[in-house]
């Protein structure tokens, strides 16, 4: 009978010539692409973030490699990254056997929050140079992501303004009482104007000085009156502190209607993930991204719950980052406003953006309402509409409305002459008097142009691509990579965190495309990222920043 033999097992055996760590890493592992990408990026701007004195810090390239590779593998916790630096051979190789703790990793992320955007921009230039993207087509969409803040830490603008108004009334009443008792002639004569915290502090100081100047007395009634005066001054001090609190709330709110006490950068908005089905608002951010070939080409956070007001600032961000605007923009109906259409037309951007009711118009059974203003016949030369009964509706004026962004829309108003006794009045309209319609001719023109583009062959292609561009990125981000909630407090730190995620997402997507094409990652890494062209890209970045600073100046 043959004797059973096992392979030698000596876990404590020493090796005379230690092997390289990466010998046990697969040739097509994405960690090699991460290493090649970061090695060939220019991180000179990171040096200004460190002090020349003190203990030598960890190399920023090593820290950047470890964090980005962790984000690629759905690891966002600094403590988990620290554990992998001791256990996982991929992290050990990237870190070069260094072992930064979780505090060091977190401090590094916070330290580079101003410079990480340049790293993202350099990566996009690399992707554009190698043909993964062109920066000509921008598919834009947004999603609401919940903040780290607690749920019930809301501060509402209307509540603050209402309570502040009530506080002003209390201050005026109290000052009138104090004026009667102390009779200050210099400071509190006029109580009709609105008080500020500084003015209220001056009044409190003057009242205290007036009380100190009063002679001491042993009379019981006078002592009682003096205690009452001091109580009124203390009450006035409490009102002053409350006024300062309300003013701080309004300063933090800015143009928003709400914010969270534990995350002042977050705004309360309704999320899609509503477990209670009651429309409860939660603190969060409106994340807007631009994609091309499922790569994230730009991103920005907004406090607006809707997407309409985010498009133009997003284009400004794109132009500041790349010193250019895209040639084509693809987006859903949430961005289809007159202001957005006009901006894109003036800047030479071909807009494949839907408007409200576009899908409804494309249904086979759709029949337009014959009494709707858009269905009425319009004579452009003489500027009048014809109602279903054939009478003219002449123009009577122009209505101007101002949007939340300050844009002014103009709507022409047309009025019928004889609606009384009309047999179609019940179907046409139900208000009293003659019918008046309001028509925005400029917006209707933009809608006609958008309809022609969307129904063209190119428009159908872009409409089909839109569903698999930003929507696919959001799906991978939330469900495949478990990035459903921000883990930092403050807009600057949240932006930093998503910048790390966007870099990791793009590298991961690039690796997936290369593997799908059958290319070996180790072979691609040898020629894909050469340090020669990085200087040109950094010059472009510096030029963008310089042009922006000159424009602001």
What name fits each language-model region?
Residues 8, 56, 67, 74-87, ...:
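Anion-binding and metal-coordination hotspots
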Residues 1-32:
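Hydrophobic alpha-helical membrane-insertion signals
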Residues 20, 28-29, 59, 263, ...:
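Secondary-structure junction/capping motif
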Residues 26-68, 441:
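Basic, short loop/linker segments at the boundary and entry of helix-turn-helix/winged-helix-like folds
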Residues 2, 14, 39-41, 62, ...:
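Intrinsic-disorder/low-complexity peptide segments enriched for small residues
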